[in-house]
């Protein structure tokens, strides 16, 4: 009995890439199904993969045949190695819809332009962290990518208003725009952007040229479907919420990042909880003007809030944390790093969160071993990541207890705690990672799941 091709193809779709490559030589019909499947998405994991790919294909007679099926190209993981030599080969593709060249700083403008010209169906482009990306690349995009929906040019410091305005005007389907630290952009771009009505995600963090809070308010009001807004460090836009219409409720907003806005007030948080009543994630790190009153306001988000970052909000106390966490029981990630007034009392409330997966308490210098014991308790069944670095009141005894008893723990950092550095516990620390601040090297101490498992085995053998 001959199995229909449709059934064969359905079975083949469950196979891994290596198995598919072997099966592609079985017959022509299988090959015709497998080749497009293998080539739909190309992601390079390391330099060896990139060079092997290039060396294999550069002299292949079928190279154009293969590239016609390429739809998603991701070179971000080989950003240090990708050059024009490699990118020239990629320009044979004509059907790419998703392009990620994040951090690929060794490629030139002409080849980027050619790749854009060859692929008119691009819907997602990521050129972030190409620090010297020429400003006129935006003109290439606006001229050649009419179907663009998502653009990420974060940290591309040469981008200017002229190109950004063209993108906004000529790409009518654009609904995700990520432009952090594009410091040459001004209110001209913000004004044009405020005329759109279908934005889903917007990141303008670090865009120091944006000054008009009223314009941002109009943008938010018009884009009722906006789900994510990040504006870290945009100090002159801090009070945009006060310009919103009193009757304007924006229930679509799920994630709001307002880090490093020292002028943000408790009254602003009160308005935020009223306007964005279904927020899941709220980031308020270094908003030093906030007090326990803000935490009281956040209790209005009790049903929706799952992620909250309040690091370095120095006026927050145990009372505020207790009040907040009595209501907000669905939190999975909470960070109070640098909140110097917090004590074991606050951690006792944190430890009772039934779905807690990640907690940050770095530099909470008033904590004692009791806090760590509490985190190790019966509610820790989901706890995966704990950050306790520079909590100088802790000892190796409590940290060892946490590592042994919290079975779901995958990461624990206790850097800078002298009472731990001088014990055998430190010998289980993971290797010091590349790029770490030199001042942290002598006091580094952290554990991943591998080291935690080794420690548990060590303890079991000693019992």
Swiss-Prot record:
Boundaries of every F-box domain copy: 1-42
Superkingdom in the source lineage: Eukaryota
Main location: mitochondrion
Coiled coil (residue ranges): none
GO cellular component: cytoplasm; mitochondrion; ubiquitin ligase complex
InterPro entries: F-box-like_dom_sf, F-box_dom, Leu-rich_rpt, Leu-rich_rpt_Cys-con_subtyp, LRR_dom_sf
LRR repeats: 145-170, 171-196, 198-220, 225-247, 249-271, 278-299, 304-326, 328-353, 354-378, 380-405
GO biological process: SCF-dependent proteasomal ubiquitin-dependent protein catabolic process
One GO molecular-function entry: ubiquitin-like ligase-substrate adaptor activity
Keyword line: Leucine-rich repeat, Mitochondrion, Repeat, Ubl conjugation pathway
Protein localization: Mitochondrion
Summary of subunit composition and partner proteins: Part of a SCF E3 ubiquitin ligase complex. Interacts with skp1.
Role, per record: Involved in substrate recognition in ubiquitin-dependent degradation.
Protein name, per record: SCF E3 ubiquitin ligase complex F-box protein pof2
Organism of this sequence: Schizosaccharomyces pombe (strain 972 / ATCC 24843) (Fission yeast)
Gene: pof2
